[in-house]
Amino acid sequence: MQSTSAQSSASHPERVFNFSAGPATMPESVLREVQDEMLCYPGAGASIMEISHRDKLFVDVLHDAESTIRELLNVSDDYSVMFMQGGATLQFSAIPANLLRGSGKRAQYVLTGSWGKKAVKEAKKEGDVDVLFDAAESNYDHIPSASDLACPDDAAYMYYCSNETIQGVQFPTEPNCPDSVPLVSDASSDFLCRPLPIEKYGLLYACAQKNAGPAGVSVVIMRKDLLDKADPNIPGYLHFKNHHDNDSEWNTPPTFAIYVLGKVARWLRDDMGGLEKMESINHEKSQQLYSVIDSSNGFYRGHAQTDCRSLMNVTFNLPSDELTAKFIAEAAEHKLAALKGHRSVGGIRASIYNAMPREGVNALASFMNNFASKNS
């Protein structure tokens, strides 16, 4: 596979730079490898989508995906790595079902954006929940300071979303959490964008379709001592121990999505050189766009406060709705696609996940400069 950060727009005459928040752009080299193997997976005599999930060929694919993720994140044997379906939405329910229901404890939630709000709504169906921090009054433009978080030592767990795609707010590091309390993270939109101290977490999960592969599979990394905490009467698919005990095959897993996820993980390891190098590239790409915003004399106004700007989702507004619509339309003419911001924030959202090539960021930065010059 190629060693560049992703595709060139010249690779196909109709291919654009895709800034979608998810499902999102993927490495072209991975897409081409999948294309080459689509009709007949090596040694199978059939497509990877056609063989049984119990077939040794697919079991090897699953194990390879798991081992590559473990290698990238330095995940120890104290943790289970599971592949599940249902996206982050399922995890909003599964986590409190496993760690809160019947515990006699209270879960602590940190709300820095829309996905945290959705998670706490589901958690309240399973037990007692406290909101430790909520940035709603500022439309979720910042993260808490250390003094804002006073998590009790006896909490069931503390939950946060490491990167809020809609608001473009990201924790630069883990929030303070007592050692006695499992730290739980929705890492869906910044999974594998940088190294992580996995040992600080009780549970970390990510749906793949933003930064790690296609829609249909979620990765759950869970400390094994927490697997037995759940009420045995919770619905079977929600019970993490069922997935751990059955090697992510408690039911038929999303075979194709796991297969592609494994290829993306190997691309990160073999082509990009691992997560430290990927993090450096992500800092460079995001800073290029933030520099345009900061030097625009107020024409572009970033949503997130500067100390928590996202590496993955660059959000900003223009002086008027009319200019925003014009920006989106003209950008599309330059093959810069899917830039419309979420309705709750408005403006522009440029999602520049791992697979967004430097060429795409260069093209967007150049367009932003030219657009501001012509419309200021």
UniProtKB/Swiss-Prot annotation:
This is Phosphoserine aminotransferase. The modification N6-(pyridoxal phosphate)lysine is found at residue 210. Belongs to the class-V pyridoxal-phosphate-dependent aminotransferase family. SerC subfamily. The keyword Lipid metabolism does not apply. Keywords: Amino-acid biosynthesis, Aminotransferase, Cytoplasm, Pyridoxal phosphate, Pyridoxine biosynthesis, Serine biosynthesis, Transferase. Its main location: cytoplasm. Its EC number is 2.6.1.52. It catalyses: O-phospho-L-serine + 2-oxoglutarate = 3-phosphooxypyruvate + L-glutamate; 4-(phosphooxy)-L-threonine + 2-oxoglutarate = (R)-3-hydroxy-2-oxo-4-phosphooxybutanoate + L-glutamate. Its cofactor is pyridoxal 5'-phosphate. The lineage of its organism: Bacteria, Pseudomonadati, Planctomycetota, Planctomycetia, Pirellulales. GO terms for cellular component: cytoplasm. Pathway: Amino-acid biosynthesis; L-serine biosynthesis; L-serine from 3-phospho-D-glycerate: step 2/3; Cofactor biosynthesis; pyridoxine 5'-phosphate biosynthesis; pyridoxine 5'-phosphate from D-erythrose 4-phosphate: step 3/5. InterPro entries: Aminotrans_V_dom, Aminotrans_V_PyrdxlP_BS, Pser_aminoTfrase, PyrdxlP-dep_Trfase, PyrdxlP-dep_Trfase_major, PyrdxlP-dep_Trfase_small. Pyridoxal 5'-phosphate binds at residues 88-89, 115, 165, 186, 209, 251-252. It is an enzyme of class 2 (transferase). The keyword Cell division does not apply. Catalyzes the reversible conversion of 3-phosphohydroxypyruvate to phosphoserine and of 3-hydroxy-2-oxo-4-phosphonooxybutanoate to phosphohydroxythreonine. L-glutamate binds at residue 54. Binds 1 pyridoxal phosphate per subunit. It is found in: Cytoplasm. One of its GO terms (molecular function) is O-phospho-L-serine:2-oxoglutarate aminotransferase activity. GO terms for biological process: L-serine biosynthetic process; pyridoxine biosynthetic process. Homodimer.
